[in-house]
């Protein structure tokens, strides 16, 4: 159908339902990402090609526990484990990584970030040790901290590209297929889906600057930012939606952080992992290469995020690059500015957090000034203001 045939019909129907001629102020919702979201789509300006992922099906990653050895094929390791065969391991302990000798039947991935965010430097010795290990992916570019600290989506991706460029300059473009990107997925369902897709676009664009055609390896985990200590059941619902967005967005591996914020139990760890199992085996959303391809809304949002992310990356490079901007405190300040805007929206109720600022609305116990520091990139949960 053409725009002229469908849009007026839709507008007339909505006018009747809303009982007003001026429908767009009601339907258009402001967002801090400054992404234009239309209430009605009939096409997309730039149809996108299928955005591939590295793995054929998404790895469902569980924190290692002996009881899961027979059921789980991909583990998060922070301690040494013996006699596990034909498994996939994501190692997040640099001391442990130093003692691992990969075998052919196993797959090892490093989740160890070689960047020192406080000093604005790369741990060169650690990076070289990891590269010498023979892991399937040796160097982790971690932007989960930035999401949990309150960075905008386009800031997260721009920073990921800027960190990647620093690694290329240090170790050459051949490092691109040795990288794994650790990305935290928040609660803005379609935006987060588009975030992963947009990153595939801009990373591939960066690789082509070096005559390569690389696809990023994405390790997606659930966010801490929208979780609350006293709201466990809602945490569980939120993280399930985040996992779904990650799988549909094309993550190569997913991991569920414990839905209990202040503590961890064997039962909570098991339930957190089984969220992935339900989505994968009942909804079967972990096997599609680009499940949201063809959705006008997601594709348009993907393109907007990609454009904003690339523009920020270019701006950062022109200003000296990621490490230099860290040393100047500019990265920290930009994240801080967006983070406090988000927190203000939480305080005002523009961002709804059920059980925190709505149903019921809790009393504020900490100010924004107490929670955030413009000189430091640190994770802050929205609910901390009320706890």
Predicted regions and their residues:
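Secondary-structure transition/capping motifs at alpha-helix termini
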Residues: 21, 83-86, 105-106, 133-134, ...
């Amino acid at each position: 159908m053409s725009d002229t045939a469908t849009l007026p019909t839709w507008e007339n129907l909505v006018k009747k339902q809303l009982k007003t001629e001026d429908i767009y102020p009601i339907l258009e919702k402001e967002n801090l990402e400054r992404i234009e979201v239309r209430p009605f789509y009939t096409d997309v300006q730039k149809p996108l090609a299928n955005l591939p992922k590295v793995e054929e099906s998404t790895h469902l990653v569980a924190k290692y526990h002996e009881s899961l050895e027979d059921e789980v094929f991909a583990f998060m390791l922070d301690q040494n484990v013996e006699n596990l065969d034909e498994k996939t391991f994501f190692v997040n302990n640099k001391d442990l990584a130093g003692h691992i000798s990969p075998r052919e039947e196993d797959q090892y991935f490093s989740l160890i970030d070689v960047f020192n965010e406080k000093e604005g430097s790369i741990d060169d010795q650690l990076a070289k040790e990891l590269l010498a290990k023979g892991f399937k992916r040796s160097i982790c570019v971690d932007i989960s901290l930035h999401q949990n600290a309150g960075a905008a989506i386009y800031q997260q991706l721009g920073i990921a590209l800027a960190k990647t460029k620093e690694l290329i300059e240090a170790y050459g473009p051949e490092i691109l297929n040795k990288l794994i990107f650790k990305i935290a997925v928040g609660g803005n369902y379609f935006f987060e889906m588009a975030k992963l897709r947009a990153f595939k676009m801009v990373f591939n664009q960066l690789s082509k600057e070096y005559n390569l055609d690389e696809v990023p390896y994405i390790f997606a985990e659930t966010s801490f930012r929208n979780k609350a200590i006293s709201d466990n059941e809602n945490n569980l619902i939120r993280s399930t939606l985040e996992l779904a967005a990650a799988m549909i967005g094309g993550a190569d591996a997913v991991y569920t952080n414990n839905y209990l914020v202040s503590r961890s139990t064997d039962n909570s760890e098991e339930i957190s992992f089984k969220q992935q199992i339900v989505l994968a085996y009942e909804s079967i959303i972990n096997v599609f290469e680009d499940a949201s391809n063809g959705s006008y809304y997601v594709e348009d949002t993907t393109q907007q995020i990609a454009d904003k992310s690339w523009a920020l990356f270019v701006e950062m490079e022109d200003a000296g690059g990621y490490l230099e901007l860290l040393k100047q405190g500019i990265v920290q300040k930009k994240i801080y500015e967006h983070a406090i805007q988000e927190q203000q929206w939480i305080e005002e109720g523009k961002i709804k957090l059920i059980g925190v600022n709505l149903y019921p609305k809790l009393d504020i116990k900490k100010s924004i000034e107490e929670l955030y520091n413009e000189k430091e990139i640190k994770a802050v949960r929205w609910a901390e203001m009320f706890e």
